[in-house]
Amino acid sequence: MPFLSSLEGVFGYGRPQTQTAVVEFNYPNFSSTAGLVEVSTAGVISNLLYITDTTGGDVGNVYRSTAIQYNRSFSFEWNFECSGGTSPPADGFCLQWTPTNNTNGGGGGSVGYLTTAVQAFTFLTYINNSFTWYKNNVIQTNVTGQNFYQNLFYWADYNHTTSTMRIYVSTTNTKPASANFTLTGLSFDSGNYYIGFGAATGGSTENHILRSMKLTFT
């Protein structure tokens, strides 16, 4: 630790205070699943987490093993691949914040979503190809005409002060300059929640592959 020789060095007098970003977790791949709870997933294959494979009528979920507070600004990034299966493929995946981490969400077009989630996003691939934001099981935003049936990189930047979430999507690991979805009025209370993903197939199928994820409090 560097020696601090003045009150300015100790307390930061005379200079602006900055918030240090803190990485809560980082999975560049899933060679290790320590800190995760898997519920009926297809397991890890070649260091990638298959939430489902192309089995019909399947549903899987994965959660962090520890519930924490999200009433602070953060950036969550993940790489998710939907591939293989039938034509048309189905059904997609969800990202959600839940009070529990030991159950599967709904199958088919519910894509593993838990109705108890305080915040959730679904990314559907079957026919409707839509993005939907749910808050306490009530639809807030629905955007059709999307294409999540590919290997995509995602960033979700949450500003707690302005109650705004901006979601960016790209086919490369370079974050776009502009957000694909800007969600206003999105906020977290002081409760502790598990962040997690769900995915499901129905009569039509696809692989739902979580390739990486990282959470940084900003």
What are these regions (language model features)?
Residues 1-20:
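N-terminal low-complexity, intrinsically disordered "leader/linker" segments enriched in small/polar
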Residues 19-218:
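Polar, low-complexity loop segments and adjacent catalytic/binding residues used for recognizing
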